[in-house]
Amino acid sequence: MEDFEKKGAEYSASNIQVLEGLEAVRKRPAMYIGDISEKGLHHLVYETVDNSIDEALAGYCKNIEVTICEDNSIVVQDDGRGIPVDMHPKEGRSALEVVMTVLHAGGKFDKGSYKVSGGLHGVGVSCVNALSTRMLSQVFRDGKIYQQEYSKGKPIYPVEVVGVTDLRGTRQQFWPDGEIFSTTVYKYEILANRMRELAYLNAGIRIKLTDLRPDEEGNIRTETFYSELGLREFVRHIDSGRTRLIDDVIYLNTEKNGMPIEVAMMYNTSYSENIHSYVNNINTIEGGTHLAGFRTALTRVLKKYAEETAQKQIEKAKIEISGEDFREGLTAIISVKVAEPQFEGQTKTKLGNSEAAGAVNQAVGEALSNYLEEHPKEAKMIVDKVILAATARVAARKARESVQRKSPLGGGGLPGKLADCSSRKAEQCELFLVEGDSAGGSAKSARSRATQAILPLRGKILNVEKSMWHKAFESDEVNNIITAMGIRFGVDGEDSKEANIEKLRYHKIIIMADADVDGHHIETLVMTLFYRYFPQLIRAGHLYLAMPPLYRCKKGKVDKYCYSDEERDDFIREYGDGNENSITLQRYKGLGEMNPEQLWETTMDPERRMLKQITIENAAEADYIFSMLMGEDVGPRRDFIEANAAYAEIDA
């Protein structure tokens, strides 16, 4: 990789490299931004903010402001150097116009301007321009304001000077195209989570997020995300709902073979492993070579230390320690910067660069060895926890072996309570996890027997967030779910905690619970189980929530099921002149109040039902919320519920 002095690198039109035109983006938008739903819509903001982050990483930008305007347009402004506006040597037009209208044009493709840069697909801001009905670019440079406007990626007029200024930087405003996106309404929380994540990943950068759309009381929201200590604060944030095993964050920030590596890790008393990895600020959900390097170093160093200091303890417990024992109760964040990342995997979020494994392995190995030598007391606490984890793993294997059935599709050994479907084609089949035996009975009568299977859940299932790993396999309800789905553990190595989903029997797993507090609790318990034990099912899009109706509204011959308070209010306005007493209103407290026919037409019929797909937009934030809502500590949970009470449905 070429080296250069960041302050000496001049950033002008000659640094902008041009690769291809924009028509392709409007024809096949999903290829460039992932999809055209809510996810892709928010991706436009990330692409634009990534430009500002690149300026910050190069040392030129300290402040980024992101604003959601009342008309759902977005403004991103930074105090970097400003996109160059001089004439491009090859293109014969302003560099700003080239950056804004040519795909893959930008400083990030010229090695001198940026050593590394973010952007999932690296498509740059021109892609945002192509997918917006209108975009306004302003550059504050050399005391002048340069401006150009575009429509669907095409310039409306040449770059012109529209005023003078003391500011420095770039301001982008865009209006997403409703003909391309299925929704153009931005969600504050989704943007806030990503901006918080970016602030932690890039210590010292201030990101201000403002939502100018007033709420019901007429208030606007604004938050500033800033982290002085970066990953050290990030790992504490994720772990704030858990009890710490040791107080220290083990931290390193170094460079190996020209690759900047930053890692923060800490141990807690929980039983789950939570490692979040990033490449150029992108969350590599599927891991990759940098994660493999981290795990190798962790196992190598801790195993050596445990064998040197606790050999008698290990022999007495009659166990052999394996890699996963070192990761139980570990929360870690790995952030690497790679000049030319190769992304693989289904969602293009797995790092393939082989050099990252060796670099991370070396960096983590050195830092961890030093920490253990300098902190014998904390090191002993870690080793004790590792031995406990290994002992529990052996117990888990025994518990699992006693219940694991031989062949998931063989028909033998399925749970007695499961009413299975007749089809054997997993992609057509659905499994309903139904709260309570009575609702389970109605669901069994209502279902389409060819493709819909029913598994009733009795009472509240085990809260796995508070339980040792092997306890799940001792719980009948959890075992029934695992067995019914055809999931196996310990296939890829005798004691692996990795769930094997190759023989998954249903491609849709639907949680069906009452629309009250108990129902929501059961949904959360089941989601926690999936998130901690088989997250790949969520990532592959197999987990759903059923949406039973809350009301049945009748007026004369009009009979309608309403799935929200808003729908009910609309019905009352339309058919009851706003008077609730003039219509017949039935409130469904539970699934059991509906007969099988009603349950089928409202909640189970694929033609008419509503389903919510469970997705993990932001793994670190999901980890934090699950640990806080389902963990031991009551304080943070109360604070969270109070802060989010406005968004939650509280059933008195």
Tell me what each language-model feature is.
Residues 89, 344-357, 561-567, 571-572:
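Helical (often loop-to-helix) elements that flank the catalytic cores of nucleotide-handling enzymes
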Residues 88-89, 96:
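Short adenine-binding "F-helix/F-box" segment of the Bergerat
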Residues 82-87:
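A short glycine-centered beta->alpha linker in the GHKL/HATPase_c
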Residues 27-46:
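Conserved short strand/loop->alpha-helix "switch" segment adjacent to the catalytic nucleotide/phosphoryl-transfer site
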Residues 391-410, 425-430, 441, 445-447, ...:
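C-terminal interaction appendages of subunits in large macromolecular complexes
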Residues 1-15, 22, 44-46, 54-56, ...:
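GHKL-family ATPase ATP-binding module
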